């Protein structure tokens, strides 16, 4: 493990971490992904009303075991820095999940888990120690609100699992992620206090985004105003190394800073920052475009990942995304901040270069 507790959220979220791969990685046209995010199942034991994959995962797709094994072979052969086990569905529902984690851990590649935390049993605790960090969905303070959001009364079970993990995890960073939505925005202060009491290393707030255009998902302006007023009352006591709540409210209730990049390409794609693998086997370069075939560079059900990456199709999609980024069309993507940092670094040389296996 490369991390050391206590985590500093300012560093974990610092987009300047993209400078290191930009400086150190050569021959960018043949590079492996710096990191990879795996969304290998659409199955989930929750039914969160704000889920950004709600419609897209209705077909209940799962990448089959033999294809996952082949993908892990590619991950190890390519020497990817960090692997996120993440969204779409709940990664801990994947059959033979523990075997895949063990295999990657034995290769010394760093891993992170983004999970709702409910299926983590006592027998899984040794496995959890193999992650660089674990981020658990932390959606409410009240039982009733948890049930409204997820469809289940899971608060007590989840809090119990967090306490168990916190008791045994030494090197692994244990964080919490709260999606701010129409059911929990009045509980943000109690959620913050609960996370502090449970002893997690950080708490990230992410305002709900209506990626699928279903309506009634994102906060209204009135609800954002309420949130801002609530946070203002505790602002002096907020620990910015623990939470991004102050930043969220200063940005008008948005996770990403509302600035538009224009006039330069998507440097993140040029340095092969991240590959996203979806539960239908599709490979994408940007999370907001997952499911849109216009931006898909290939499918691991049809051929090996190593045949897709740096292929002609891959290069074509990079050109398309470069064009869109130059015109200021990109939004709700972490690469926007990376690109802003790199553009400034290219022009001025300014920025703090440090290694982080996850982009």
Residue spans of the language-model regions?
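Conserved alpha-helical substructure of the radical SAM core
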Residues: 2-133, 144, 148, 152, ...
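Radical SAM enzyme [4Fe-4S]-AdoMet core and its adjacent flexible, acidic
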Residues: 1-2, 7-10, 39, 63, ...
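Residues that line or immediately flank small-molecule/substrate-binding pockets and catalytic motifs
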Residues: 55, 87, 138, 207, ...
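Short, hydrophobic secondary-structure boundary micro-motifs
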Residues: 84, 175-176, 317-318
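Short, solvent-exposed turn/loop segments enriched in Gly/Ser/Thr/Pro and often Arg
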Residues: 88-89, 246, 332
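The −1 position to Zn-ligating cysteines in a subset of zinc-ribbon hairpins
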Residues: 43, 47, 265, 329
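Flexible mid-to-C-terminal extensions adjoining Fe-S/redox cofactors in radical SAM and related proteins
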Residues: 1-32, 54, 258, 282-283, ...
